Amino acid sequence: MKTSTNKPNEEVRAFAKNIRMSAHKVRRVMDQIRGRPYAQAYILLKFLPYKACYPIFQLLNSAAANAKNNMSFKKELFVSRAEVNEATSSKRFHFRAKGRSFCIRKQTCHITIVLKQLPEQ
């Protein structure tokens, strides 16, 4: 997992590349946490019954740790941007009857999470 901070004191990004899951299945979970406060997203990921929650949960914790340790954010955080992009897919062949074969595509995806501080009221 890669992390970067392009804009100082504004946002923290965390990337996970080549996760061995379909982007469509990961988007189902990312739509649930987008725009929510960190604590609420943490609880949602802990209890949602999808396999895609685990890598997103790890990535969210990594981004929060970077916000605390590298950027010294002390206020509440929220998920400002959460996106999933398709990555390369590897092809495997499944051999069938009568000399035929079918192509099986093993899909991967890239996940990006951006955390920001909640604006002061």
Curated annotation (Swiss-Prot):
Cross-referenced PROSITE patterns: RIBOSOMAL_L22
Entries under Pfam families matching the protein: Ribosomal_L22
SUPFAM superfamilies, sorted: Ribosomal protein L22 (SSF54843)
Any one GO molecular function term: structural constituent of ribosome
GO cellular component terms attached to this protein's record: chloroplast; large ribosomal subunit
Quaternary state and interactors: Part of the 50S ribosomal subunit.
Annotated function: This protein binds specifically to 23S rRNA. The globular domain of the protein is located near the polypeptide exit tunnel on the outside of the subunit, while an extended beta-hairpin is found that lines the wall of the exit tunnel in the center of the 70S ribosome.
NCBIfam families linked: rplV_bact
Family, as annotated: Belongs to the universal ribosomal protein uL22 family.
Protein name in the entry: Large ribosomal subunit protein uL22c
UniProt organism field: Welwitschia mirabilis
Gene: rpl22
